[in-house]
């Protein structure tokens, strides 16, 4: 996908500052993790398809310098991180995982938490 110069700069700056490029896993693939619920895996695919259809750049399987791998990274247009919650609640996410992101300067507004068990409405992503 061709990005506008300002969006490309945003992406480049984000990757330079926050992404661990030494970790050699293929980005932009969706790993079928046995530890995730079926609903979680399906919801990730649905969101990725929606982002593709909307021409919004995103990445998956991106290892951050803080060691986290968010479900979906979308540093332009919408929340930077999209996390699909399968068995955990928003409270669980913020109490167990958020501190790693917060230590890198991210805030709660940088996250969109999507419940894997609730039907996704496209407008929820904007």
What function would you assign to each model-found segment?
Residues 1-31, 35, 98-99, 116-126:
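Non-catalytic C-terminal interaction segments of nucleic acid-processing enzymes
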Residues 18-63:
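Acidic-basic catalytic patches of nuclease active cores, encompassing PD-(D/E)XK
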Residues 43, 66-68, 93-97:
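Amphipathic coiled-coil/heptad-repeat helices and related helical stalk/stem segments
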Residues 53-56, 74, 103:
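Secondary-structure boundary motif
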Residues 66-82:
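Active-site beta-strand-loop-beta-strand hairpin of nuclease catalytic cores
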Residues 79-126:
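Catalytic cores of nucleic-acid endonucleases
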């Amino acid at each position: 996908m061709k990005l506008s110069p300002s969006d490309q700069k945003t992406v480049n700056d984000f990757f330079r500052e926050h992404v661990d490029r030494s970790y050699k896993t293929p980005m932009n693939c969706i790993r079928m993790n046995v530890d995730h619920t079926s609903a979680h895996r399906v919801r990730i695919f649905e969101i990725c398809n929606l982002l593709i259809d909307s021409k919004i750049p995103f990445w998956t399987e991106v290892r951050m310098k803080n060691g986290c791998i968010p479900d979906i990274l979308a540093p332009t247009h919408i929340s930077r991180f999209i996390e699909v919650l399968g068995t955990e609640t928003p409270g669980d996410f913020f109490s167990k995982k958020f501190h790693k992101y917060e230590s890198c300067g991210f805030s709660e507004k940088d996250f969109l938490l999507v419940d894997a068990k609730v039907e996704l409405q496209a407008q929820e992503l904007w």
